[in-house]
């Protein structure tokens, strides 16, 4: 039986990006071309991921890469996680460079508030 730590280690950003590429391109061959790998390497990686998670991610009865319901769930959540990772990296970079994520405006009564809001 695979431990929870092993399952977490298998769900790398690279594995999630691979799943996204396969689903987006519709085939292992097209995904492999896009990723600069050979199809057998992707097939092996997907099988390793399936074995670790103990689920089938793709229906192999057709030539196209068709996700199972478990594969679809991993794709949706994986895309969300990849977006979160990108957002974290952007926030860290902004903090490191001194870019402020908040802007505070003080508006005097001499300015029409509506005009200020229109500028935003």
Regions found by a protein language model. Name each.
Residues 50-69:
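A short LG(V/I)-centered, amphipathic sequence patch enriched
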Residues 33-34, 51, 72:
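Alpha-helical residues within the helix-turn-helix
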Residues 93-112:
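Interdomain hinge and pocket-entrance segments immediately C-terminal to HTH DNA-binding domains
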Residues 38-41, 45-48, 119:
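Residues within the DNA-recognition helix of helix-turn-helix
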Residues 15-22, 74:
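Short alpha-helical "packing" element that flanks the helix-turn-helix/winged-helix DNA-binding module
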Residues 21-36:
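Short helix-boundary/capping micro-motifs
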Residues 12-15, 39, 71, 78:
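The N-cap/first-turn positions of alpha helices
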Residues 52-53, 74-96:
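Alpha-helical linker/hinge and terminal dimerization helices associated
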């Amino acid at each position: 039986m695979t431990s929870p730590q092993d399952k977490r280690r298998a769900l790398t950003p690279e594995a999630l990006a691979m799943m996204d590429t396969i689903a987006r391109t519709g085939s292992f061959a097209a995904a492999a071309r896009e990723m600069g790998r050979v199809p057998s390497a992707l097939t092996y990686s997907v099988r390793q991921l399936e074995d670790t998670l103990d689920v089938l991610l793709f229906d192999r009865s057709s030539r196209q890469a068709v996700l199972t319901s478990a594969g679809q769930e991993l794709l949706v959540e994986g895309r969300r996680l990849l977006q979160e990772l990108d957002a974290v990296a952007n926030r860290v970079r902004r903090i490191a460079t001194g870019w402020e994520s908040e802007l505070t405006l003080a508006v005097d009564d001499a300015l029409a508030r509506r005009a200020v809001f229109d500028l935003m």
